[in-house]
Design a protein with these regions (language model features):
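Extended surface/linker regions that mediate inter-domain or inter-protein docking
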Residues: 1-31, 133-194, 199-202, 206, ...
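Electrostatic cytochrome c docking/interface patches
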Residues: 31-55, 67-72, 173-215, 301-311
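Extracytoplasmic electron-transfer domains, predominantly the class I c-type cytochrome c fold
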Residues: 36-47, 72-149, 235-292
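Short, non-ligating residues that shape and space the ligands of small metal-coordination modules
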Residues: 68-69, 227-228, 278
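Surface-exposed patches in mature extracellular/periplasmic domains of secreted proteins
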Residues: 127-133, 155-162, 271-273, 295-301
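Conserved catalytic-core motifs of eukaryotic protein kinase domains, centered on the activation segment
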Residues: 231-233
Length: 311
């Protein structure tokens, strides 16, 4: 059988039509049947402008917006659902992460943390590879922050309401003076955590590890000498805590551990329980206690059974 030009054209058109049907029409029909998820809501006008800036400035190249079953990081308690993305055109799922996934990022930090972060990411995350976005100016940066704070939709709205509530309380405590501020911060910690014994020696090696952790995670806000005057400080309200005022204020290792682990919602202090395992939290707490507070309860009783590597 000879292949005529007409047969080639018709065959090619049939193949093209099949591809269009499978790749375009079938997914379109399927997505039209998708129902909104329990967290879905439409974007505000400011969030929509911020999303355009997010795309235009290449944020999607490094940040995905899809939590998968294999993920163990931020937001992994809830796996992404098709109904989360009904208003996304285009969808910004992403497949490779240089930075963290941002789909649940809304409300994880207060707005002022994001101002410092976008001005220079090293101010809040000293090891960050992210470029600075101070060139956007205050107005565009504000739109970008609104977009990020909306990621997570209704769940993000709940987190943002919590940030706003606790920020007002944290600012009031700070403005009441150092004594009232420290007392308020300590009052938010369960008694059991305040009294938990610090099992780790302040050894030379442990303090060196704590110093490295402090440089990698804490220096941008609390500063190199722990006085709260890191490069992020001018952008933050309330400002980072000055550790040097904590001497003789009954700051136990358990208090430091709890605050590092859980953070202080409403302030720029994030939680680190997903990034630092228990020993690293103890060691950076010991570093702060020894070098900035000059008061440590390390290696206190009851210690239980020492770990195998301990002297």
């Amino acid at each position: 059988m000879r292949m005529s030009p007409l047969a080639v054209v018709i065959g090619s058109l049939l193949i093209l039509a099949t591809i269009v049907f499978v790749v375009v029409l079938l997914p379109y029909v399927h997505t039209n049947q998708t129902t909104p998820s329990e967290i879905f809501r439409n974007r505000s006008a400011e969030e929509a402008v911020g999303r355009k800036l997010y795309i235009a400035n290449g944020c999607v190249y490094c940040h995905s917006q899809s939590i998968r079953t294999i993920d163990w990081g931020l937001g992994a308690e809830r796996i992404a659902q098709a109904g989360d993305y009904l208003a996304d055109h285009p969808i910004l799922l992403g497949s490779q992460r240089t930075g963290p996934d941002l789909s649940p990022a809304g409300g994880e930090h207060p707005d002022d943390w994001h101002v410092a972060h976008f001005t220079n990411p090293r101010y809040t995350r000293p090891l960050s590879l992210m470029p600075a976005f101070r060139f956007l100016g205050d107005k565009k940066m504000g739109y970008l922050i609104r977009h990020v704070q909306g990621l997570g939709m209704k769940a993000a709205d709940r987190r943002m309401a919590r940030q706003v509530e606790w920020k007002a309380k944290a600012i009031a405590a700070y403005e009441a003076g150092p004594d009232a501020n420290v007392a308020w911060l300590n009052a938010q910690i369960p008694q059991g955590w305040r009294d938990v014994p610090n099992p780790y020696l302040t050894s030379e090696a442990g303090l060196a590890r704590g110093h490295k952790i402090y440089q990698d995670f804490c220096l941008g806000c609390h500063g190199p000498v722990g006085d709260g005057m890191g490069p992020a400080q001018p952008f933050l309200n309330p400002p980072p805590l000055n550790f040097t005022i904590l001497k003789n204020r009954e700051i136990s290792g358990g208090i430091l551990y709890y605050q590092i682990m859980n953070g202080i919602t409403g302030t720029a202090m994030p939680y680190f329980k997903r990034e630092l395992e228990a020993e690293k939290i103890w060691e950076v707490g010991n570093y702060v206690a020894v070098n900035f507070i000059n008061d440590s309860d390390a290696d206190s009783e009851p210690k239980g059974i020492d770990a195998a590597y301990e002297p």
